[in-house]
Design a protein with these regions (language model features):
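N-terminal Rossmann-like NAD(P)+-binding domain of SDR-like oxidoreductases, especially those catalyzing
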Residues: 1-143
């Protein structure tokens, strides 16, 4: 039986709350990957079942090499998630949300891992007519 769940963005608000829930409701071991651009170490939970790894999703294959045969599912929250800052940091936003997410999707596909992906309402805009108002929305809508 596969014994691990991976959460990208595990030191962020959504990821850390999901880790808390999974610790209470499951027996899985949890691997959190976060680059700490917005996530915080203060969100870490003290549990022997959680392993925190600093890293970027663009390197997910290397980061999870030793775990890949034991991963049941992967929750992908680890992306550049600031709309205003995406205008000033387009390259960083594109690298994380487009290239990093592609690497996560490929990793899951290649290793037959269930993927749970969190999108954003910013991709919809006004009935989809203005969905690309920010670099953030553009990169998310293309995933």
């Amino acid at each position: 039986m596969k014994s691990h769940i991976v959460i990208t963005g595990g030191a962020g608000f959504v990821g850390s709350n999901l880790i808390s829930y999974l610790l209470k409701k499951t027996k899985f071991k949890i691997v959190s990957i976060d680059n700490y651009s917005t996530g915080k170490k203060k969100n870490h939970l003290d549990s022997k079942r959680v392993k925190y790894i600093r890293g970027d999703t663009i390197n997910i294959n290397k980061i999870l090499r030793k775990y890949k045969n034991n991963i049941n599912s992967l929750f992908h929250f680890g992306e550049f998630s600031r709309i205003y800052q995406s205008f000033k940091n387009f390259n960083k936003c594109f690298e994380s949300n487009s290239i990093g997410s592609k690497e996560v999707f490929k990793f899951c596909l290649d290793n037959k891992i269930k993927l749970i992906y969190s999108a954003t309402s910013a991709t919809l805009g006004k009935k989809g007519k203005d969905k690309n108002l920010s670099p953030y929305a553009f990169t998310k809508s293309n995933n």
